[in-house]
């Protein structure tokens, strides 16, 4: 009951309008005003600028430039692992799926079909598979990288709500990650198909991929899809695949099989890009 009461204001707030305003502010070239905003943000969230490729706050023309900053070369060495962690952040949940059911938080599950925008055939490829939900806080590095080598097959934009995706909201909003706006990226690998879902949230101005650029805005009320069978996009493990312009959550789906997550992982634990995420033998 407390969890639902805690998120009640989010049902009442004009989330779309707030997000639109935040996106305009983040993209504005405000000179000294922008620099002061970034300085406040760095101090408020204890952002480690020493590991940024460009640590000089005043050199960023917009807040978005700062928020999507690159890291210094070598700041995130890649583990020798079948699957590496694709982001900096914290583990929300991970584990095995029961059929199409994905565990969100205590008392809450949602379906893989709902997550991928209603495509039952796509979701069926991951029945009884594995999932990982990773939360990116405001202080984190906000580029998303490949957990393994992969070939892009499809990208699906799914319109939705813009609830916050912090742990409190995950406890209080049923089906949160299948309700929010999201971008579903479908890949093929030597270990079978996998899905990377970029989940939007309140104040997340937009999401972008390296092959498409900014996916939203413009925001749509209908599901949109792009296919890449004739012009496949090939990405190596550790390569950037996308980014959040203001932060959110990544959900990954893997098919049924002998996947073993890192035994050091646990819900709520901090994670870093490049660390070992799981063992997953190649297909025979």
Swiss-Prot record:
Enzyme nomenclature, EC number: 4.1.1.65
Listed cofactors: pyruvate
Topological relation to the membrane, as annotated: Peripheral membrane protein
UniProt PTM comment: Is synthesized initially as an inactive proenzyme. Formation of the active enzyme involves a self-maturation process in which the active site pyruvoyl group is generated from an internal serine residue via an autocatalytic post-translational modification. Two non-identical subunits are generated from the proenzyme in this reaction, and the pyruvate is formed at the N-terminus of the alpha chain, which is derived from the carboxyl end of the proenzyme.
Involved pathway(s): Phospholipid metabolism; phosphatidylethanolamine biosynthesis; phosphatidylethanolamine from CDP-diacylglycerol: step 2/2
Keyword Cell membrane: yes
GO molecular function: phosphatidylserine decarboxylase activity
Site-annotated residues for Cleavage (non-hydrolytic): 247-248
Substrates-to-products reaction catalysed: a 1,2-diacyl-sn-glycero-3-phospho-L-serine + H(+) = a 1,2-diacyl-sn-glycero-3-phosphoethanolamine + CO2
Modified residues (Pyruvic acid (Ser)): 248
Primary localisation category: membrane
InterPro entries with a match to the protein in the record: PS_Dcarbxylase, PSD-B, PSD_type1_pro
GO BP annotations listed: phosphatidylethanolamine biosynthetic process
Keywords from the named record: Cell membrane, Decarboxylase, Lipid biosynthesis, Lipid metabolism, Lyase, Membrane, Phospholipid biosynthesis, Phospholipid metabolism, Pyruvate, Zymogen
Entry similarity comment: Belongs to the phosphatidylserine decarboxylase family. PSD-B subfamily. Prokaryotic type I sub-subfamily.
Record's function text: Catalyzes the formation of phosphatidylethanolamine (PtdEtn) from phosphatidylserine (PtdSer).
Protein name from the UniProt record: Phosphatidylserine decarboxylase proenzyme
Native species: Albidiferax ferrireducens (strain ATCC BAA-621 / DSM 15236 / T118)
Gene: psd
